Amino acid sequence: MPEQFLSTPEALTREFYEWERRGRGWQVWHQPVAIEPPFRPFFGHFTSGAPGAVVDDGRRPTFLTQLVDGFWKARKPLAEAITPYEKVEPSPLFIEEQVSLVEMQAVLPPETKITKDAAGQFLMSLGDVSRPASFEIVGTSDSILVQLASAPRDQRQMREQLQAYFPEALSSERKRYLEAAWDRSGGKCTVVVEYGLSKEFMRPLRCFERFDPDPLAGLIGAMATLDPDELAIFQVLFCPARHAWAESIMRAVTDGMGEPFFVDDPQVVKLATEKISSPLFAAVIRVAAQSPKSARAWRIAEGIGKSLRQLSDAASNELMPLSNDGYDEEQHRDDVVNRQSCRLGVLVNRDELVSLVHLPSA
């Protein structure tokens, strides 16, 4: 609908979603990008059309409900008028240089249990890496390996922190293991699927207080029945978010008086507060599979994807497989091995990320 025909609640709701969707991991660009979404502050809910636009701090219905003025409660405006601002959408940072990452494979001795606290502290210790790290579970008919890949300049830090938080882990450094396992000749059918957030990114995924049973157990189990010449990969590219998302998140879900922006979904304020209760990360969550048969490659990828359903919270958020429309197929295949992405990452907090990025218990 043309903007001049939108009611005020419709215009403000649309403005909210234009800002919010950047954090869901949906957007695809024509070349690899930095995975943290380009940041634009959310200053508050007001119309930005005519000069002297009046601040309207009424609470609005969600995007999926009817947007009608009857939902609004009349309130005294916070201010008589504001100075309109011009929204300039920043472009992502495009990645021109490819870096061959060093892989560190790690395994825990039998009966070793990983705590959520140790796994979370390990993630936080990687805050100064020069480029996103990659957590990977790679399955073949012979083995299932867990590895962390990082830029050569970050490898020492990765190794030291891994030893500090998981001294019992047995680790070894390798180069090009994934590249050697990944078929680039076109002789195998390849499926690559990324997962994004289904709902507003400030709604957190289900988080686990304990890793007993391990959240990754189902995913690893889905790789246990691979045939020869088949490959399965679960890959998470991740890095700490650098921008001040927390402040904008709270301004986006509240009106100017601190009340919920969405009158029929006041719970979103509590959920957003939970989201920013631990540091935010950008992450590309990816599943890849290869097999001589296309149908089989899809079944492998779907089997891994089903294991991600345990992160779903019906009252909050869930991961959903994303369309590859606009993502060049050859580029997509190369991005798996190069640990890069033409798709922006999702914004998740540490507690959400650690459910997916940790050494699985033996």
Task: For each feature predicted by the language model, list its residue ranges.
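Extended, folded cores of ATP/NTP-driven motor/assembly subunits in large transport
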Residues: M1-A362
